[in-house]
From Swiss-Prot:
Complex formation: The RNAP catalytic core consists of 2 alpha, 1 beta, 1 beta' and 1 omega subunit. When a sigma factor is associated with the core the holoenzyme is formed, which can initiate transcription.
Classification lineage: Bacteria, Pseudomonadati, Myxococcota, Myxococcia, Myxococcales
Gene3D superfamilies xref list: 3.90.940.10
InterPro entries: DNA-dir_RNA_pol_omega (IPR003716), Pol_omega/Rpo6/RPB6 (IPR006110), RPB6/omega-like_sf (IPR036161)
Record function comment: Promotes RNA polymerase assembly. Latches the N- and C-terminal regions of the beta' subunit thereby facilitating its interaction with the beta and alpha subunits.
Protein name, as recorded: DNA-directed RNA polymerase subunit omega
Highest taxon of the lineage: Bacteria
Keywords of this entry: DNA-directed RNA polymerase, Nucleotidyltransferase, Transcription, Transferase
GO biological process: one example: DNA-templated transcription
Enzyme Commission designation: 2.7.7.6
Catalytic activity entry: RNA(n) + a ribonucleoside 5'-triphosphate = RNA(n+1) + diphosphate
Amino acid sequence: MARVTVEDCLPLVDNRFALVLLGAKRARQLMAGARPILEQSKNKPPVLSLREVATGRVKFDRDVREALSGKYTGDEPK
């Protein structure tokens, strides 16, 4: 994979907005010192995070997806 595009990731993520949130969250984790899932490369964290999404190794948690859609049913403090 020479370049990672949105189209490479969209089959694995519901929509472009969710992809942006997922990629940004993973990039922040990598910058904070999280271990990369893929082999070490000279890619910057945002590119590496999209590569991880494109391979299907990074996915949205169901609770996050429901919270973003406004349908979260978890135990929320009242």
